[in-house]
């Protein structure tokens, strides 16, 4: 039986997003970089304030408080306290989930609007 070689997943970076804005929208490279940076700064700042971020058709980012809890050192078995903390969670939209479930289908250009 033959085996199917799956392509190694790649990582999309902020620099690549800026390059895509430059190519597809016609912004100059400086403007494209500034837009990408500002977009992520606004998301980061909102989450730092404890606000949720909803990106329609993509998903929701939320800040959640995790209470303190007992943990265990795996080497010694000793119980150690884990401090309370805030974490960011992401819940993908149904639209994003269905696109991800079809990894080989090209994205619908209309859904990018």
From Swiss-Prot:
InterPro entries noted in UniProt: Hist_DNA-bd, Histone-like_DNA-bd_CS, IHF-like_DNA-bd_dom_sf, IHF_alpha
Residue stretches of biased makeup (Pro residues): 104-113
Record function comment: This protein is one of the two subunits of integration host factor, a specific DNA-binding protein that functions in genetic recombination as well as in transcriptional and translational control.
GO cellular component: cytosol
Alphabetical GO biological process terms: DNA recombination; positive regulation of metabolic process; regulation of DNA-templated transcription; regulation of translation
Organism of provenance: Bordetella pertussis (strain Tohama I / ATCC BAA-589 / NCTC 13251)
UniProt keyword list: DNA recombination, DNA-binding, Transcription, Transcription regulation, Translation regulation
Protein name: Integration host factor subunit alpha
Cited Pfam families: Bac_DNA_binding (PF00216)
PANTHER family linked to this entry: DNA-BINDING PROTEIN HU, INTEGRATION HOST FACTOR SUBUNIT ALPHA
Positions of region (Disordered): 59-80, 94-113
Regions that span the bilayer: none
Assembly information from the UniProt record: Heterodimer of an alpha and a beta chain.
Family affiliation: Belongs to the bacterial histone-like protein family.
GO MF terms, alphabetically ordered: DNA binding; structural constituent of chromatin
């Amino acid at each position: 039986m033959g085996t199917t070689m799956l392509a190694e997943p790649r990582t999309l970076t902020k620099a690549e997003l800026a390059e895509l804005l430059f190519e597809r929208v016609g912004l100059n490279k400086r403007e494209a970089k500034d837009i990408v940076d500002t977009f992520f700064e606004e998301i980061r700042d909102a989450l730092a304030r404890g606000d949720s971020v909803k990106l329609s058709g993509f998903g929701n980012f939320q800040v959640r408080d995790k209470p303190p809890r007992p943990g265990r050192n795996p080497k010694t078995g000793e119980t150690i306290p884990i401090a309370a903390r805030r974490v960011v969670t992401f819940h993908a939209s149904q639209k994003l989930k269905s696109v991800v479930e079809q990894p080989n289908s090209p994205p619908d250009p209309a859904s990018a609007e």
